[in-house]
Design a protein with these regions (language model features):
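Non-catalytic cell-wall polysaccharide-engagement segments
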Residues: 1-13, 32, 54-155
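Short secondary-structure boundary/capping segments within folded domains
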Residues: 12-15, 37
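Short, functionally critical alpha-helical segments immediately adjacent to catalytic or ligand/cofactor-binding
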Residues: 15-32, 48, 100
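Residue-level detector of well-ordered alpha-helical segments, enriched
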Residues: 16-21, 41-44, 113, 117
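Short amphipathic alpha-helical segments at helix boundaries and their inter-helical linkers
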Residues: 29-42
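A mature extracytoplasmic/lumenal domain signature
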Residues: 41, 50-52, 121
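Glycine-centered small-residue hotspots that permit tight backbone geometry or close packing
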Residues: 44-47, 72-73
Length: 155
């Protein structure tokens, strides 16, 4: 737990506290760095998918430029995102947490509530945030207790 907590502390790009991100990572991958490798489209600790990575790369450009990107800039951002997604960098724990939390922050910035942001982040899983929130609240009181994750989210 201490190692994942330190990784989250150093790489979280969202406004969400580290306990929320730790619970989210556990729910997504059970802390398995190579989750999804050669199995499906969701990859790494935060189970990032290609379109999510593309959205982050495009959003980065919008923030840098202070405006919407042109079609050419969007295509360049998508090409860079695809290169990242297809590389082993997607499985680097630090990079995966950075891009996953950037993606979460994108939705936090777009949606009216944190709950809606998590719902949009996850897609159709209505219960996603309702599982993460109570787990994170318990973990905040006992930060090194992995049992909280196992009981709150599952094995």
């Amino acid at each position: 737990m201490k190692q994942i907590r330190q990784l989250v502390r150093n790489n979280n790009k969202s406004i969400m506290g580290e306990d929320y991100i730790i619970c989210q990572i556990y729910k997504e991958s059970r802390f398995k760095q190579f989750a999804g490798k050669n199995k499906h489209n969701a990859k790494g600790l935060m189970q990032m998918q290609r379109n999510a990575v593309r959205q982050v790369f495009k959003y980065r450009q919008q923030k840098i430029k202070g405006r919407m990107t042109t079609d050419k800039e969007t295509n360049e951002a998508f090409a860079n995102a695809d290169t990242f997604y297809k590389s082993d960098k997607i499985f680097d724990e630090k990079e995966n947490i950075k891009i996953g939390t950037e993606y979460l922050q994108y939705w936090i910035d777009k949606e009216a509530t944190i709950e809606e942001a998590y719902r949009t982040y996850r897609g159709t899983d209505e219960a996603y945030y309702s599982v993460i929130k109570p787990c994170a609240e318990k973990l905040a009181k006992d930060p090194d207790n992995i049992q909280i994750l196992m009981e709150g989210i599952g094995r």
